[in-house]
Amino acid sequence: MVAIMNHNFFEQSKIFFENGDIKNTLETYEKAISYIDQKEKSSYLQFLNQILSYCRENNLKEEEAVVLRSLGRTHSIFKQYVESLKYHEESLKIQRQLGNKMDVAEGLLYLAEDLEVSGNYENCIKAFQDAEELFRELGKLRKTKEIQKELSRLMDFSKQMVEDEYYLKEFNIDKY
């Protein structure tokens, strides 16, 4: 069932792209991301790169930023976090230039998730804090509370890691 839903969304997205409807292409692909088939990795990445080229050739900056974010999310699903981070950073750069705070805030959340997975907790926390600030400015209080829970969890985890590291060094446990 999941594979069928993904296939339908992915195929719909391709049809929209062939018809030149970039907005619906990207919206439909966003739905397909939730059902990505791990065996079709190259198809997804190739498709997104085609859209990215089209957006760049036609100077569609807003759409380019969305495609870059989708590339980041797709690489993340395939556990290619270095590539994912690269695309998220590039997307955020464009979103900031465009001044769309909502897109920047959402992009920061995706960036934070990948930073956490890659073990870069300091930058992860910073990205979550920046996203929280933007969501607060936008009046998205529910989202702000969700981020605060994530931040609390990360702070507790970081504190535990520091304590564990201290005990390992203090009692020479790491030498055995």
Predicted stretch roles:
Residues M1-Y176:
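Intrinsically disordered, low-complexity regions
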